[in-house]
From Swiss-Prot:
Recorded family membership: Belongs to the cytochrome c family.
Single GO MF descriptor: metal ion binding
Binding site for heme c: 23, 26-27, 89
Keyword Metal-binding attributed: yes
PTM: Binds 1 heme c group covalently per subunit.
Organism: Arabidopsis thaliana (Mouse-ear cress)
InterPro entries in UniProt: Cyt_c-like_dom (IPR009056), Cyt_c-like_dom_sf (IPR036909), Cyt_c_1A/1B (IPR002327)
Protein name as catalogued: Cytochrome c
Subcellular location per the Swiss-Prot or TrEMBL entry: Mitochondrion intermembrane space
GO cellular component: mitochondrial intermembrane space
């Protein structure tokens, strides 16, 4: 298991670009924007897997039971299907730790 090195602050600007090119087609960021193909990400940090109202999760997501934080997102974003076998998340993951830190830094600000 890799753990996020939170002492290495990511670049939110680079994270914004990653979100736009890799995530925005399926996810929204702000309260009230609603679910798309994937659940809205508003309030992501501190939320349990499989808990966004109105989104149809797989049993695997509902039963994972972890809380989204820097370290859990860091591991998940490397390979979502490995972290939650049975997820319907189609995204293949971000292999570079720097990219994951950049995206997490962006998400920490934009999903509040």
């Amino acid at each position: 298991m890799q753990v996020a090195d939170i002492s290495l602050q990511g670049d939110a600007k680079k994270g914004a670009n990653l979100f736009k090119t890799r995530c925005a087609q399926c996810h929204t960021l702000k309260a009230g924007e609603g679910n798309k193909i994937g659940p809205e990400l508003h309030g992501l940090f501190g939320r349990k897997t499989g808990s966004v109202a109105g989104y149809s999760y797989t049993d695997a997501n509902k039963q994972k039971g972890i809380e989204w934080k820097d370290d859990t997102l860091f591991e998940y974003l490397e390979n979502p299907k490995k972290y939650i076998p049975g997820t319907k998340m189609a995204f293949g993951g971000l292999k570079k730790p720097k990219d994951r830190n950049d995206l997490i830094t962006f998400l920490e600000e934009e999903t509040k």
